[in-house]
Amino acid sequence: MGFSHGVSKTLKSPKSLSLLRSYYSKFNPYPSIFGLNDHRFGLIKHDYCSNTRKENINPIDLSKYPTERIRNFSIIAHVDHGKSTLADRLLELTGTIKRGHGQPQYLDKLQVERERGITVKAQTATMFHKYNFHGPNIGDAHEPPTFLLNLIDTPGHVDFSYEVSRSLAACQGALLVVDAAQGVQAQTVANFYLAFESNLTVIPVINKIDQPTADPDRVKAQLKSMFDLEPSDCLLTSAKTGQGLEQVLPAVIERIPSPPGYSNSPLRMLLLDSYYDEYKGVICHVAVVDGMLRKGDKISSAATGHSYEILDVGFMHPELTPTGILLTGQVGYVVSGMRSTKEARVGDTLYHSRTSVEPLPGFKPAKHMVFSGLYPADGSDFDALNHAIERLTCNDASVSVTKESSSALGLGFRCGFLGLLHMDVFHQRLEQEYGAHVISTVPTVPYIFEYSDGSKVQVQNPAALPSNPKKRVTASWEPTVVATIIIPSEYVGPVITLCSERRGQQLEYSFIDSQRAFMKYRLPLREIVVDFYNELKSITSGYASFDYEDSEYQEAELVKLDILLNGQPVDAMATIVHNLKAQRVGRELVDKLKKFIDRQMFEITIQAAIGSKVVARETISAMRKNVLAKCYGGDVTRKRKLLEKQKEGKKRMKRVGSVDIPQEAFHELLKVS
């Protein structure tokens, strides 16, 4: 409806329609496809409301683009190396968006992305570009053919590495963008190997050559030494000024192979991503690997087994553009009446319901690596928080949510996230979009404990692990990551010290060039989950670049650390730590709590304990009313009697009184590693 409505406003006259024709003729050498009587795809005629004119709208004929004329590629880069600006320039070069459109980072800031935050993790855009693949034409007898280019824009962050790998599976090539001044960074390394493992053709693009500190020759040498990419293959560009951009699209067409699918095989589509639209429901980004898809087809999901009818199909040019059909090798969107994005699993295979096909390889369900409890700051706001989380998870299927209760914080939710960035953005959106003020508990990672009877249990919430279990814990395991760190060589010493303190194991250590060092460490995920990146930036004056990927579980001596207030454990503050660090972490926790818990009319004892063994203790003295103020001398026994009475009252208060824990205390506990 949105597309039809937009057309009804713009096409007020035949003159406007002719402008649309001339606009598309820039991309398409086949003007016949814009004829008014083309009934092949069922999108010719739209009926509008009484105050608008009836117009005939014709889609682009996708059958004119066999797989030989299709190129699917992605742009991968480290943060701030110019990926989004380069994507903007390519969209402008092909006429997909107008120059000076007033919206920089167009693919990062489509309406759905601006409104949905992290939900639209992969965005696609279809472009048309005329290019003579076999050298210049002699005379004007033949017009150069038009190629259909699908840009699949992916995030660079490690939290979404699975989504990125699925998006790359739909590509045959990638532009590896590197800053001419900063050179190869940690995410450059991670992204290159993701593309390399997917067997993609990698085209190195050295961007920002207009900067005064740019040194393209040094970057070429780095790319050669680290990835064995030939210096002669590198493209030198400046997305900001437009310098060198004219060589990017020809390189994409010449170097990247066409999609390898079979048009006469049964339909197989790879689901790249999805988002929720209030009017259309779930909109899925898909890549057609084999076969073809038409509007009205019945499709099934290999992951869930559910069946759907295709209500709308098309591509992003750059907004939703209905075509009624998608052919082999093409990338676009489908609307199938899904109610929730939880039904749209990233990496899933979609196929015609009447056929049986082999699912595409590589599908994995979402793997949650960080868990945190979310509670309303005001206990009475549980229903409002419940509504906010339901609305948010309707759009972001990668968050797991289960209800839980805490004796200290009341009713709340235990949420699982893909990583730290995912968790931070989720919290931020809850507050910004829904005004939900939440208390979040210390983030934890999934541990595995084995008991003396041989049973194993995965623990996502430390409070669920008994402090004095009836069965003895015989072994425990924690998840680890392989971290890539690139730093200036003068900071090598402090970084090695930091990684050693965080129980890191060095895997690799080399120099990229005379100025920068490359290091790989295996680190427990628990050690980097809170403040490792901040510490790393601090000791390297902000020059470090850091990236990580999930690794296997490793055995570790883990213990549950309880926080007790006046002898009562606070379940929301329990945490699981390594035995060697338990005393230090316990001391830090009780010191923080002493600063943030207000004095009461009775004494408060704060303890950190492992089972029944107390490892750290602090006491907050009681506020004391001067009960002797009214005694002006006289018998000392009168004063003693008043003091004894006060002492008894304090004891009774301590026994029945509750300690109020401010929200700031929970936020401060997040910073204790």
Curated annotation (Swiss-Prot):
Gene3D superfamilies: 3.30.70.240, Elongation factor 4, C-terminal domain (3.30.70.2570), Elongation Factor G (Translational Gtpase), domain 3 (3.30.70.870), P-loop containing nucleotide triphosphate hydrolases (3.40.50.300), Translation factors (2.40.30.10). It is a peripheral membrane protein. Its EC number is 3.6.5.-. GTP binds at residues 77-84, 153-157, 207-210. InterPro entries: EF-4, EFG_III/V, EFG_V-like, G_TR_CS, LepA_C_sf, LepA_CTD, LepA_IV, P-loop_NTPase. GO terms for cellular component: mitochondrial inner membrane; mitochondrial matrix; mitochondrion. Keywords: GTP-binding, Hydrolase, Membrane, Mitochondrion, Mitochondrion inner membrane, Nucleotide-binding, Protein biosynthesis. PROSITE patterns: G_TR_1, G_TR_2. It catalyses: GTP + H2O = GDP + phosphate + H(+). It is found in: Mitochondrion inner membrane. Coiled coil: none annotated. The keyword Hydrolase applies. GO terms for molecular function: GTP binding; GTPase activity; mitochondrial ribosome binding. Residues 68-260 form the tr-type G domain. GO terms for biological process: positive regulation of translation; translation. It is an enzyme of class 3 (hydrolase). Belongs to the TRAFAC class translation factor GTPase superfamily. Classic translation factor GTPase family. LepA subfamily. This protein may be expected to contain an N-terminal transit peptide but none has been predicted. NCBIfam families: lepA, small_GTP. Promotes mitochondrial protein synthesis. May act as a fidelity factor of the translation reaction, by catalyzing a one-codon backward translocation of tRNAs on improperly translocated ribosomes. Binds to mitochondrial ribosomes in a GTP-dependent manner. This is Translation factor GUF1 homolog, mitochondrial.
